[in-house]
Swiss-Prot record:
Belongs to the UFD1 family. The modification Phosphoserine is found at S129, S231, S245, S247, S299. Pfam families: UFD1_N1, UFD1_N2. This is Ubiquitin recognition factor in ER-associated degradation protein 1. Essential component of the ubiquitin-dependent proteolytic pathway which degrades ubiquitin fusion proteins. The ternary complex containing UFD1, VCP and NPLOC4 binds ubiquitinated proteins and is necessary for the export of misfolded proteins from the ER to the cytoplasm, where they are degraded by the proteasome. The NPLOC4-UFD1-VCP complex regulates spindle disassembly at the end of mitosis and is necessary for the formation of a closed nuclear envelope. It may be involved in the development of some ectoderm-derived structures. Keywords: Acetylation, Cytoplasm, Nucleus, Phosphoprotein, Ubl conjugation pathway. One of its GO terms (cellular component) is VCP-NPL4-UFD1 AAA ATPase complex. It is found in: Nucleus; Cytoplasm, Cytosol. It comes from Mus musculus. The keyword Acetylation applies. Heterodimer with NPLOC4, this heterodimer binds VCP and inhibits Golgi membrane fusion. Interacts with USP13. Interacts with ZFAND2B; probably through VCP. GO terms for biological process: cellular response to misfolded protein; ERAD pathway; negative regulation of RIG-I signaling pathway; negative regulation of type I interferon production; proteasome-mediated ubiquitin-dependent protein catabolic process; retrograde protein transport, ER to cytosol; ubiquitin-dependent protein catabolic process. GO terms for molecular function: K48-linked polyubiquitin modification-dependent protein binding.
Length: 307
């Protein structure tokens, strides 16, 4: 008994309402067509031939359609969704990062099987480069990128495109299973330290000893102007009823303050006033005081003086 296959591609097999077949896989960049399909590279979905849609429509397949991809030569497997059914017969197109996980080359054989996966509740990722820390809000970026994915598999290294740069993330853990569906799910996301990341060394801070007297060298400045520092005189020549004003202050006594540029937040410094007290001056001698209207007057009309 002989069997003939008139097609160059394998015929899909159906076992107990399960889709299972083999395809020659190629990267999305080799997909023929006028439109740029770079959007497929940004997600976790594949492009299958129309015959697969015909077979799947006859089966009692639960939606969304999820598939398990297996490379039997390297014993590597992953999970994915389907984006379109426009590939040539016997061929499927995969994102480049998915082919790297499966260790597949262009034109290699991959086993495609339909599966049902549980909805994800938790996932943990490890960035493969410290450059991922440059992203301001990594959770928001990851949430936006995962909209193009249908499922996650523990151990996979997925690639996301952000700000014209490719970031790779390893799926460290998924719950409740090692392969989960992330379509319409409420999933908690956590991050591991990036691969090759080192904690920055913090400088050792030595406690500064508190000196007995404050150092005023940083507050030295030019001599300031002091208003109303002179002495006054009364018209009647009498002595003022208050104590005499102090002598002019020496240039070194009053100095303009300079801000302390070495001030540290949270540190309180009690500065002692080490300036000497102003000494009182003695009263001026009586003869040395100014007496108003003490001169001689002159008259325009000369009068004889009485003896």
């Amino acid at each position: 008994m002989f069997s003939f296959n008139m097609f160059d591609h394998p015929i899909p097999r159906v076992f107990q309402n399960r889709f299972s077949t083999q395809y020659r896989c190629f990267s999305v960049s080799m997909l023929a067509g006028p439109n740029d399909r770079s959007d497929v590279e940004k997600g976790g979905k594949i492009i299958m031939p129309p015959s697969a849609l015909d077979q799947l429509s006859r089966l009692n397949i639960t939606y969304p359609m999820l598939f398990k991809l297996t490379n039997k030569n390297s014993d590597r497997m992953t999970h994915c969704g389907v984006l379109e059914f426009v590939a040539d017969e016997g061929i499927c197109y995969l994102p480049h990062w998915m082919m790297q996980n499966l260790l597949l080359e262009e034109g290699g054989l991959v086993q495609v099987e339909s599966v049902n996966l549980q909805v994800a509740t938790y996932s943990k990722f490890q960035p493969q480069s410290p450059d991922f820390l440059d992203i301001t809000n990594p959770k928001a970026v990851l949430e936006n990128a995962l909209r193009n994915f249908a499922c996650l598999t523990t151990g996979d290294v997925i690639a996301i495109n952000y700000n014209e740069k490719i970031y790779e993330l390893r799926v460290m853990e998924t719950k409740p299973d090692k392969a989960v569906s992330i379509i319409e799910c409420d999933m908690n996301v956590d991050f591991d330290a990036p691969l090759g990341y080192k904690e920055p060394e913090r400088p050792v801070q030595h406690e500064e000893s508190i000196e007995g007297e404050a150092d005023h060298s940083g507050y030295a400045g030019e001599v300031g102007f002091r208003a109303f520092s002179g002495s006054g005189n009364r018209l009647d020549g009498k002595k003022k009823g208050v104590e005499p004003s102090p002598s002019p202050i020496k240039p070194g006594d009053i100095k303009r303050g300079i801000p302390n540029y070495e001030f540290k937040l949270g540190k309180i410094t009690f500065i002692r006033n080490s300036r000497p007290l102003v000494k009182k001056v003695e009263e001026d001698e009586a003869g040395g005081r100014f007496i108003a209207f003490s001169g001689e007057g002159q008259s325009l009309r000369k009068k004889g003086r009485k003896p």
